[in-house]
From Swiss-Prot:
GO terms for cellular component: cytosol. PANTHER family: CHROMOSOME TRANSMISSION FIDELITY FACTOR 18, DNA LIGASE. The gene is ligA. The active site is at K114. One of its GO terms (biological process) is DNA replication. This is DNA ligase. PROSITE patterns: BRCT (PS50172). InterPro entries: BRCT_dom (IPR001357), BRCT_dom_sf (IPR036420), DisA/LigA_HHH (IPR041663), DNA_ligase (IPR001679), DNAligase_adenylation (IPR013839), DNAligase_N (IPR013840), Hlx-hairpin-Hlx_DNA-bd_motif (IPR003583), NA-bd_OB-fold (IPR012340).
Amino acid sequence: MGSMERLRQLVDILNEYSYQYYVLDEPVVSDKEYDQLYDELVLLEKELNTVLEDSPTIRVGGDVLKNFKAHNHLAPLWSLDKCKTPEELISWDLRVRRLLEGSGVPIEYVMEYKFDGLTLNLTYNNGQLVQAATRGNGTTGEGILEQVKTIKTIPLTIPHKGRIEVQGEGLMGLSVLAAYNKTALEPLKNPRNAAAGALRNLDPKVTAKRKLSAFCYNVGFYEGIDFNTHMEILAFLKANKFPVSNYTKKFHTIHQVIEEIETIGEQVKSLDFLTDGLVIKVNHMEARRLLGYTQKFPRWAMAFKFEAEEMTTELKDVIWQVGRTGKLTPAAVLEPIDIGGVTVSRATLNNWEDIQRKKVKIGCRVWIRRSNDVIPEIMGSIEETLEGAMDIEKPQHCPACHSEVVERGAHIFCPNSLSCKPQLVSRIVHYASRDAMDIVGFSEKTAEQLFEELNLRDLADLYEIKYEDLIKLPRFGDKKARNLLEAIENSKNCKLDSFVYALGIPNVGRKTATDLAKHYKSFQAIQEAEFQELITLPDVGDIVAQSIIDFFEDEEIKKSVNRLINEGIRPLFKEVEQQENIFLGKTVVVTGTLEKYGRKEIKELLEKLGAKVTGSVSKNTDFLLAGEAAGSKLEKAMEIIASGVETSLRIISEAEFEAML
C-alpha cells in the first residue's frame, strides 16, 4: 500500500471510529487501538508533509445529532493532547518552558481527575442557568437544558451575574448504577453510557431516574470577572456552589507531578465514579495565552492516561462472523466479568493468526485488557489453564452458507459472494444506501426479507421485484410496497460516481469513486481502465488500482454488472459547464448554519461553480462562507486577516454569497 493511500485509509478509519464514539456513544475499538492508529497517522503526516482536509488531527470531536437543537458554544471546548509515560510528560514540560522562556511568567501546574462521563457546557446569564449543551464537535453541541436540570448538584442560579460558560462532566456513580440495576427491567451496562444515554434522552424524566451527578472544572467564557490562575477559577466555581472535585493539587515542577501520579493509583480505585486518567494544566492564564493552541489542542494542558485495566475470565466460545467482503472475523464469547464498572462478555479476535499468536483455546482463561469504556481486547491465555481446553477450529467452511473458504494473507474469506446471506444482505444494503443508489426506505431488515422470502441473490434482482411479491411480505402494506418500487425505479437514473461506489469495489470509497468518474467520464471506460493510468489518480495506489482491475475482470461480477445495465441502470457523468464566476478555481470553507442550504447542498453547489471546498481555514483560503453561529473557523479567519499576512481571504455571509452568484 502506498503512503498516500495509507494516509487516506487511516483518516477514514479514525473518522468512523470517532463517529461511533462521540456521536453514537457506541465505541467499537479500544482506546489503545485508536491511539496506535492515530499515532501512525501523525507520523505519516509529518513524513509526507501532508494533512488531509478531514484528518482527525485537526478536528475537535464529532458531528451533532439531529434529535436536539444545536447550540453554539461561546468559547470552544478543546480536546486534550495525551500521554502515557513520565518521559512524555517531561518532554511536554520542556516544550512549555521553551515557549515561555524570557516571559517572566511563573510556571506552575494544576492536576485534576480526568472524568469518564459526558462533557457538559453550562451557560449562565444574569445568574440563571439558561442553557446546557453537550460538547458536540467543540464549537456546536446539542442543547440538553431540561435534562441537565435534573442533576441536583448543578445550580440553577448562581451569585455571579455576568454571562459565563462553565465546563464539567455528567456522571453516574458506581454505587448509583448498582442500585439502579437491582430494580431495572433492563440493567445498564456501564456508568458512562448510562450518563450519556440519560442526558441525550428526549424525555427528561428518564434522565431524572438515573440520579446523575456532575463535576465542574473550568470556565471557558466569562464576562464581568477575570482570572489570573486556574486555581482562581476553581475558587470561583466553589464560591458559586458548583460541584468541584475535592482532588485538585498545584505543583511547581513536572517531577512533583510525576511523583504524585506514581502514588495515586489506589486512591483512584476507591472512587465511586470512573476516571480514565489525570489532567495537568498550566496554572497561570498569562502563560496559557502565550502558549496558545495547536489546531486541535491547547499547548497548556496534557491528559495523562492510566494503564488499561487487565483481568482474567474464561473463553466460552468463538463465533465466526461474515462481513460484506466475505471476510470471516472471529468474535470471542467470554464468561461475563466486571472491569471498572463495565460488564464485559465479548471481545474481537482479529483473525486466525491472532488466535494462534495469543494461544487461546475454548475453556481456557484469558487476559482481558480494557482501556476506558471500549470493547476489550484479549491479550493472551493463562498457560496453566490450557490443559484440557478445546482447540479453536480453523473454519474450513463458511458458517453462513457452508461454502469452502479460502485464505488471503492473514484473513479467511467465503468466496460465495452470490448466495452467502451475510455478504449479499450487506452488499444490497450498501448498494441502496444514501451515498450509493439512494433507494429511499430501504433497510437491512428489508434486504433480509428480500433474501429470505423473494430469493433475491443478485443486485439486479432488485429491479425485477413486483408489487405482487412485496405485498405478501410481513410489514409491507400497499403504500410501503409502492414507495419502495418507485424508489428502486428512480435509482436507475443515477450519477456515475454513485453507481461505482454502490458496486462495492474493494478499497474504493466514496471519494475514489468520484475521482474515477471525473477522470474516465463513462462506466465503460472505468471497466476498461489500465493499471498505469489508474495509479496516476489522486490517492489511488497499487493496491486500489489492482482491486479495481480484479473486480471488473471477475466473470461473475461481469455478469452481475451486465444484468444491472440490461435492467436499465444508466450511470451518467454530467460534465458541468462552468461559466466564468467569482468562485471558479477558488478555495472555499463553509462554517456555521446556513438558512437556505444544508451542508451537502452548499458543497455540491460550490463544486458545480468550480470551487474547491475544504474543511480548514488558512491564508490560502479565498472565501469563508459564514452562517449563523459560526465558531472557531470564523475566529481563525478573522485572526488571519487581522495579522496582516498576505492573503486573499474574504469572509462572506449567506446573503453576500447569493448576491455574488
